[in-house]
Amino acid sequence: MLFRSLSGLLDDLSYNSARKVENVALYEQGRVFFRDEDNERPREVEHVAGALTGLFHEATWNASKKPVDFYLTKGIITFLLSALGITRGIRFEATAKHEEMHPGRTADIYLNDQLLGFVGEIHPNLAKEYKLKRTYVFELDLEKIIAAPKGELVYQEISKYPTIPRDVALAVPNEITN
């Protein structure tokens, strides 16, 4: 299942990086084709893949810069699955079986005992080939996700008082008129 959707995303990251756009996050949804020994035609499976490199967000006055890493990418996947109603039975299992991936920074994603996909950092040799810095990718089988049993969605009322991420007060002496 590895890299059926991701090679195009890595090409796009490389294109952006060559033009000095260092902080990029992309995703792609589409069909992946598997050779089926029993049939002439390949089997089509709907997948979603993503690739992130650089900073997740720049430094601001109240937060330091946050580079993309394994745990951030894993969190994006967990959030996506949760938004789709899959909150139980997800586990991430470390693996070294994907040769294009960094052996110590890759995990297969399971729903109960069913393989959904993988997440991890691309192998340094592959990153060098694409002229990329640390890059994290994931690929998920959408058909298995759609077919998975979903938890009950719970409505949560929106607060009447919106949050304010920034509150600025200026103290100006009375002598200043303009």
Predicted regions and their residues:
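Extended beta-strand-rich architecture
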Residues: 1-178
